[in-house]
Every structure is written in structure tokens, then in C-alpha cells.
Amino acid sequence: MVTSLKGRDFLTLADYSREELLFVLETAKHLKQRYLAGERVIPLLPGRHLAMIFEKSSTRTRISFETAMRELGGDALYLGWKELQLGRGETIEDTARVVSRYVDGIMARVYEHEKLEKLAQYSRVPVINGLSDLLHPAQALTDIYTIMEKKGSDLSKLKIVFIGDGGDNVLHSLMLGIGILGGKIIISSPKGYDPDPRIIKLFEEKAVPNGGEYEIIRDPYEAVRDADVVYTDVWVSMGQEAEKEKRIKDLEPYRVTVELMKHAKSDAVFMHCLPAHRGQEVVDEVIDGKWSIVWDQAENRKHVQKAILALIIP
């Protein structure tokens, strides 16, 4: 039985057990129900402050974390990378030491995952991964919450398929989360776009003992046959602009189209963490069509992040 997660960092889902992830998901469900019932502020973190450090820009991450803190009775401070002394040469170590003297938690959205690990190492308060080049755990846990909300809580009974870049940071976190919870994820990507070996190693250590599985199927039509969930993400992330032409060419056969979705179950759902590059990884008819739950998925970011914040910030 989980009693407390206070003071824990939230850098990767691999740091959490099956029971702990379910505890966060159940807390998110409870908080969302109270919000929808009219409780716009649930003061679980009164007087607490969250520093939000952004090396990479964002719409959803900033708004969802900021509103989440305020709805928990706390406050959030936006700190752009260039606005901090980080942009003028101060080390991450010193930044972590100083910022953590002023606030109760730090959320950081960075390019290299190692920066998050260094922040956490030198911070006196919990550090939350708002996105890195390797992982996006808050997004993935939101996705799992949304899948359970729409399709039921037993992931082992669902066929969940990710189409596109197998090295995607959201996919990496989805693999770990779904696997730790005992589910299976199918990845359909071209050769050369497989998951990072570090994630495969973590999956084998943390997910396989819980019954987690993953499978790579190169043919997207074969992969989505009878799928319950079809998920995709952008082909060119921030920092990959130099590879844009090659990536688009390589991944073009993995575009999610109406024809592809017809091979999934009739009640299948389509997911995307957003922002979407319409016409690249997905066509308008899918993201705006009957399969799409992307807007519910985006809304759930706030509720899941409220649970994370409420549970780990002392």
C-alpha cells in the first residue's frame, strides 16, 4: 500500500512501482471529479511555489502546470532559460542550489535529459520532468489515464499501437508506463527509428517483471489491425530541424490516415500529445474525426499533473 510520495523527483516513470503509478492515477481521477463537481480550488498546496524552468518553449506544459498549481492553492513562476543566469553561464548545479532555496518544487522542460538529472542532484526540492529529449513522463501518464478513462483500467486487454518515430520521447515514457502497469505496446516505425537502447534496458528491468511487453512491427497496416488505441507524435521535434527532410521522407509511410484507421477496431481511438503537424504524421480527417480524443487527452494533462504536484511537493 502506498502511503506517501512526498519529496520524490518525477524524472521517469521507471522510478515508480506499479502501485505508485496507480496511486497517482487514482488521485488524478479523484481531483478531476472534484473539479468537474465545481471545486475549482482544492487547497492541497497552500502557500507552495513551483518554479517552471523552460529551455524549450511550450503551450500545454506551461498552461497546465501553472493552472494546476493555482487550483491546488499554490503559485507557479515562469522562468525562461535566457531570463535566468543559466543563459549567461551560471551552472545548472548552482541554479538548482539557489532556486530550490526559494520554492517548493521545480518543473523543467529541457533539451538534454542529463540537465534534469543534474538539477535533481543539486536541488533541495522535488524536480519534475516537463519534457526532455529522452522522456516525457507527465505526458505519458496523462495518456495512460486517458486510455483508462476511455477504454477501461486493464491495459493488458487493450491493443495499443504507436505509429511513427520509435525514438520519440513520449513513446519512451509510454513504453515504461504501460509496461510497468502490465500492458503491451506495439511500435510501428521504420528501421533506424527504434527506441533508445537505454529505454529498452529500463523496460527489461522495470516492466518485464510486471508482465509488460513491447513489439516492433514495421508494417503500419499490420500493426494497427484490430487496435484499440492508435497513437502518433510529430516526426521532427525541436532540435531535429537539420534532419527534417530525411525524417519526413523516412516516416511518410507511417502517416495516420483514414485508410489506416479503418484497419483498427470500429471503436478505436486516436491520440496525439500535440502540437500536431497536420498533413505530416496525421491528416485532418483523423485528428478532427470520430476517432480523435486528443482534446480530452490535452485537458487531462492538468488533472494528472495536479495529482503529481499534490503528491510529491512537501
UniProtKB/Swiss-Prot annotation:
Pathway field: Amino-acid degradation; L-arginine degradation via ADI pathway; carbamoyl phosphate from L-arginine: step 2/2
Keywords: Arginine metabolism, Cytoplasm, Transferase
Main location: cytoplasm
EC number: 2.1.3.3
Pfam families given in the database record: OTCace (PF00185), OTCace_N (PF02729)
Catalytic activity: carbamoyl phosphate + L-ornithine = L-citrulline + phosphate + H(+)
Top EC class, one word: transferase
Function: Reversibly catalyzes the transfer of the carbamoyl group from carbamoyl phosphate (CP) to the N(epsilon) atom of ornithine (ORN) to produce L-citrulline.
NCBIfam families for this protein: orni_carb_tr, PRK00779.1
UniProt protein name: Ornithine carbamoyltransferase
Organism of origin: Staphylothermus marinus (strain ATCC 43588 / DSM 3639 / JCM 9404 / F1)
